[in-house]
Swiss-Prot record:
It comes from Idiomarina loihiensis (strain ATCC BAA-735 / DSM 15497 / L2-TR). Binds 1 zinc ion per subunit. It comes from the Bacteria. Homodimer. The lineage of its organism: Bacteria, Pseudomonadati, Pseudomonadota, Gammaproteobacteria, Alteromonadales. Keywords: Aminoacyl-tRNA synthetase, ATP-binding, Cytoplasm, Ligase, Metal-binding, Nucleotide-binding, Protein biosynthesis, RNA-binding, tRNA-binding, Zinc. This is Threonine--tRNA ligase. Pfam families: HGTP_anticodon, TGS, tRNA-synt_2b, tRNA_SAD.
């Protein structure tokens, strides 16, 4: 007779095997009504799952993250149900959960249109309103295969043949006449799948392989209630307004061309911001005693083979040949930095040696994955490598952590999630080395009172890493900074130092990036600030506008003075009404709008307005310059 232990420690005894739903009903009718699924001894299961032995259980409802995840997964099945009713010959591939939603890949002769998506959503709503029960049946591998052969579902058959052992018992979920295969869990009833929206469609190769057939992917979002769905759609609308590609066009920051996919054409305004980011990071590098270096753009394939990158990374590397030698354009900077370290004999007294580079890297990302500045082929890393002894690791990692947090705070990011990624399946080095690496990073985080969680199997192939994820004003997550420990690469490339014992030792290498890709970080900033850059980053910091031609000479003189002081200023001397000029430069998001009339000329002053519409009144020019210089020096965030 199973004894069920609940999260609060209370226990309930049953005289026969009991399901999660029955336990919920025993606790209370309201809880049973809200039950989506459950956990048995930590394992997420369907509400119909029977408990035959003593166990600890948790009830999962739509208020839980797991509950929302399950609702989204079941909405993917609901989409499959609707599509098969409308296009019976459609072949269903996969329908997983993704961030904030789900998708289904579908093979059908009909090309879906926006009108079709609206019809699919309407049919899904009609089906969900009937609140039909979702019935899970466990089948043998053979029974599952026969089911999908009978239903002419080749993708489900392939999944069974290639991915599922023949001794497995796949879960078949019955949505009335529609059957889908999944490990689950899923909602027990479609009453939970009421708050969703079909978002868009795209092409997707089966199994992500361009040699396979292109399928049609339909995306959707789903939430626990109407309020959550509405809030999400509002966030999307705001994100659309903040799209860095639109703002870049409006502010003349950069552009793209088909002749250079994934490569940025920086315009003066955009390059000004880019250089300010570099300048700031250089200041931090000096503060933390890094040496700035510059490695070659291309190196012989032999070096990449020796480093291990060729084996693990070659499909993403651009290559070229010359004089019977094959070269690779660098996708990362670390092998080059080891070569610089190897020049000249190093002693333990030289360690730690902190080496940094604004490395221009290239990766041959699939064209379909490219997305503005967020996913490019040519990018600049604020990359650094610290060569140190094992005894110095924790102190050096602590310094990196401090530098990361200070940098993000400068840009206004203070909500930071930290993950420790551990050994992947494909990796360099032995288990003992990985044990030491993972322990060192975990201890450095604990010693600095950093809350973190583990990402098992997500480390780099050469060592574990700490990942820093920022959350922007819309709640979106951006993984930017990394600190990676590497006991493997220095040894592979022959890096050594002479220790206190006069013997040669291999240094530990710490890979460190804060912004990550400067291009991507700039895209994040454009959207975070919605183009309203803080003064120190703004391409044009001040614009001066005359009211009549009488003030033109004074405006030119003031602009020259400001530029000589290092303040990026421009003049608008057009024969337009002052209100028109103010509106135009407000839309261009220039931080300070200075209006000059006869009175300002006579007094040697400027009338100051902000892009937010605030009238700050008249300032003597020197006082205004002091204000701007202070704001830039402190890198004030609006």
């Amino acid at each position: 007779m199973p004894v069920i232990t609940l999260p609060d420690g209370s226990q309930r005894e049953f005289d026969k095997p009991v399901s999660i739903m029955e336990v919920a009903a025993d606790i209370g009718a309201g809880l049973a009504k809200a039950t989506v699924a459950g956990r048995i001894d930590g394992e997420l299961v369907d509400a119909c799952e029977l408990i035959e032995h003593d166990a600890r259980i948790e009830i999962v409802t739509p208020k839980d993250d797991d509950g929302v995840h399950i609702i989204r997964h079941s909405c993917a099945h609901l989409m499959g149900h609707a599509v098969k009713q409308m296009w019976p010959d459609a072949k269903m591939a996969i329908g997983p959960v993704i961030d904030n939603g789900f998708y289904y890949d579908i093979d059908v002769d009909h090309t879906f249109t926006q009108e079709d998506l609206e019809k699919i959503e309407k049919r899904m709503k009609e089906l969900a309103k009937t609140e039909y029960a979702v019935v899970k049946k466990k089948a043998s591998w053979k029974e599952a295969r026969e089911t999908f052969v009978e239903r002419h579902e080749p993708y489900k058959i392939e999944i069974l043949d290639e991915d599922i052992p023949t001794d497995a018992t796949p879960g078949l979920y019955h949505h009335e006449e529609y059957i889908d295969m999944c490990r689950g869990p899923h909602v027990p009833n479609m009453k939970f799948c009421q708050h969703f929206k079909i978002m868009k469609m795209a092409g997707a190769y089966w199994r992500g392989d361009s040699d396979n057939k292109m399928l049609q992917r339909i995306y959707g979002t789903a939430w626990a209630d109407k309020k959550q769905l509405k809030a999400y759609l509002q966030r999307l609308e705001e994100a659309e307004k903040r799209d860095h590609r639109k703002i870049a066009k409006a502010q003349d920051l950069f552009h793209w061309q088909e002749e250079a996919p994934g490569m940025v054409f920086w315009h003066h305004n955009g390059w000004t911001i880019f250089r300010e980011l570099e300048t700031y990071i250089r200041e931090k590098m000096r503060e933390y005693e890094y040496q700035e270096v510059k490695g070659p753009m291309m190196m012989d394939r032999v070096l990449w083979e020796k480093s291990g990158h060729w084996e693990k990374f070659s499909e993403l590397m651009f290559t070229t040949s010359s004089e019977n030698r094959e070269y690779a354009v660098k996708p990362m900077n670390c092998p080059g930095h080891v070569q610089i370290f190897n020049q000249g004999l190093k002693s333990y007294r030289d360690l730690p040696l902190r080496m940094a580079e604004f490395g221009s890297c290239h990766r041959n990302e699939p064209s379909g994955a490219l997305h503005g500045l967020m996913r490019v082929r040519g990018f600049t890393q604020d990359d650094a490598h610290i060569f140190c002894t094992e005894q110095q690791v924790q102190e050096e990692v602590a310094g990196c952590i401090k530098m990361v947090y200070e940098t993000y705070k400068t840009f206004g990011f203070e909500n930071i999630d930290v993950k420790l990624s551990t050994r992947p399946e494909k990796r360099l080095g032995d288990d003992a080395t990985w044990d030491r690496s993972e322990t060192a990073l975990a201890q450095a985080l604990k010693n600095n009172d950093i809350d973190f969680s583990y990402l098992p199997g997500e480390g780099a192939f050469y060592g574990p890493k700490i990942e820093f994820t920022l959350f922007d004003c819309l709640g979106r997550a951006w993984q930017c900074g990394t600190i990676q420990l590497d006991f493997a690469l220095p040894g592979r490339l022959g890096a050594t130092y002479v220790g206190e014992d006069n013997e040669r030792h291999t240094p530990v290498m710490i890979h460190r990036a804060i912004l990550g890709s400067l291009e991507r970080f700039m895209g994040i900033l454009i959207e975070e600030y919605a183009g309203h850059f803080p003064l120190w980053l703004s391409p044009t910091q001040v614009v001066l506008m005359n009211i009549t031609d009488n003030q033109s000479d004074y405006v030119r003189k003031v602009v020259k003075t400001l530029n000589e002081k290092g303040i990026r200023a421009s003049a608008d001397l057009r024969n337009e009404k002052i209100g028109f000029k103010i509106r135009e430069h407000t839309l261009k998001r220039v931080p300070y709008l200075l209006v000059v009339g006869d009175k300002e000329v006579e007094a040697g002053e400027v009338a100051v307005r902000t892009r937010g519409g605030e009238d700050l009144g008249k300032f003597p020019l020197e006082d205004f310059i002091t204000r701007v210089e202070d704001e830039v020096r402190t890198r004030k965030i609006d």
